[in-house]
């Protein structure tokens, strides 16, 4: 394959196809049949006098499938019309780009439905967890992992997540384990209910409580007035306390608690 002429425009492309009275545009989705394997790609019949070529790097967004093993002679499927190579006079096709478009469409649907997801873990870095959703790389920040243990033995396993932030234009996909845990326990997380948990962090603005897989915050304003100035002496990490649920933030996966409202 030769490098595409960068000066080639959509108008030039239209002119090439108008010569054959064929109505196609870059970005179109076309049906085609694979009829020949080349060294670095396959030839595809899409019904045009101009030949169509699928480079190996455009076979799939999945690195494990980005080879010829998933393709066969006479396979008929849809392709994304990616480019036109002036020098080789070939239409350049892509399955990878088509998968990308459909993946984001599916993700937008999952976001609208606020779905609880089973997502494959791809690895970890200092900031959190790297996952794969619909072939798109996503990220779970440490602040939304709750108590999930970050270790290599978890790689390729599945974790329950919910979407947190989706920005298709910047290819930014942020998910939350914390939101998923709140959703799974939602039937028991009723405002006014009393829960019991263990203090796992003491800060100037309150107490962080671990109750099972969930984390909650007793803000300093929700601790008994007499105890506010003596938090370090009144509480220590590992203490078991009871608190009342005063707010469940399902969008951020946060649990707000109060000790002032205990009867």
Swiss-Prot record:
| Signal peptide as annotated in the record | none
Q: Tell me the keywords, alphabetical order.
A: Chloroplast, Plastid, Repeat, Ribonucleoprotein, Ribosomal protein
Quote the SMART domains the UniProt record gives.
S1
> What's this protein's name?
Small ribosomal subunit protein bS1c
> What residue stretches are annotated with the S1 motif domain?
27-96, 114-178, 192-260
**Can the keyword Kinase be found in this entry's annotation?**
no
* GO biological-process terms attached to the record: translation
Give the UniProt entry's GO cellular component terms.
chloroplast; ribonucleoprotein complex; ribosome
- Superkingdom per UniProt: Eukaryota
Q: Which CDD domains match?
A: S1_RPS1_repeat_ec1_hs1, S1_RPS1_repeat_ec2_hs2
Which cysteine residues pair off into disulfide bonds?
Answer: none
Q: Localized where?
A: Plastid, Chloroplast
**Which family, according to the similarity comment?**
Belongs to the bacterial ribosomal protein bS1 family.
- MF terms in GO: mRNA binding; structural constituent of ribosome
């Amino acid at each position: 394959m030769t490098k595409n002429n960068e000066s080639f425009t959509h108008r030039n492309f239209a002119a090439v196809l108008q010569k054959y009275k064929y109505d196609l545009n870059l970005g179109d989705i076309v049906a085609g049949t694979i009829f020949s394997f080349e060294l670095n790609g396959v030839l595809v019949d899409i019904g045009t006098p101009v030949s169509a070529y699928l480079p190996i790097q455009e076979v799939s967004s999945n690195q494990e499938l980005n080879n010829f093993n998933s393709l066969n002679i006479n396979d008929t499927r849809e392709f994304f019309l990616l480019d036109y190579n002036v020098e080789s006079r070939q239409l350049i096709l892509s399955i990878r780009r088509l998968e990308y478009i459909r993946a984001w469409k599916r993700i937008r649907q999952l976001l609208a439905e606020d779905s609880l997801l089973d997502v494959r873990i791809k690895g970890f870095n200092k900031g959190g967890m790297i996952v794969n959703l619909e072939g798109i790389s996503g990220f779970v920040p440490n602040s939304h992992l709750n108590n999930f243990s970050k270790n290599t033995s978890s790689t390729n396993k599945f974790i329950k997540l919910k979407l947190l932030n989706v920005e298709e234009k910047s290819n930014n996909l942020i998910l939350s384990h914390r939101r998923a845990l709140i959703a799974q326990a939602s039937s028991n997380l009723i405002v006014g209910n009393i829960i019991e948990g263990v203090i796992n962090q003491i800060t100037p603005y309150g107490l962080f409580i671990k109750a099972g897989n969930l984390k909650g915050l007793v803000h300093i304003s929700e601790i008994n007035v007499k105890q506010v100035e003596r938090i370090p002496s009144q509480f220590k990490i590992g203490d078991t306390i009871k608190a009342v649920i005063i707010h469940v933030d399902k969008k951020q996966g946060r649990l707000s608690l109060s000790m002032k409202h205990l009867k």
